[in-house]
Amino acid sequence: MTQTIAIILKFREDKAADFRRLFKAEVLPLWCKFKLQGKIISASLTPIEGGMPAERGVRSYILHVEVPRMAQHEEFDSNPLFNKFLPKAQAMQPEEPLVWFGETLFQV
C-alpha cells in the first residue's frame, strides 16, 4: 500500500504570502520532478478555510502527500533542495507543524 502524509502548517499572517511564493518557487518544482519519476502519487497544499476556529494572526494550510512507500517519503525529506527550503519556511512559523503519516488503508 501507499503512504499518506498529512501536515498542518501555520504561518504568521504577515508571512503567509511570502511562504506561498517560496513554496511555489522551491517545493512545487520538486513535487513535479518526483511526480514525473513516480515517487509522488499526489500532493497538494490547501489553505484552511473552515472546520476549526481560525487563530488570530495565523494562516493555516493542509499539506497532503501520497507516495508509493516510506522510501520515497524519506528521499524527499533528505533532498538538498528541500533541506535548503525548510529553514526559511520554519522561520515564518509561530509553532511546529502537526505531522501525521501512515500506510493508506482505503482509497478511490
What are these regions (language model features)?
Residues Q3-R12, A43-P80:
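Short, well-ordered beta-strand segments in beta-rich or mixed alpha/beta enzyme
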Residues K15-L45, L81-L86:
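Short amphipathic alpha-helical segments
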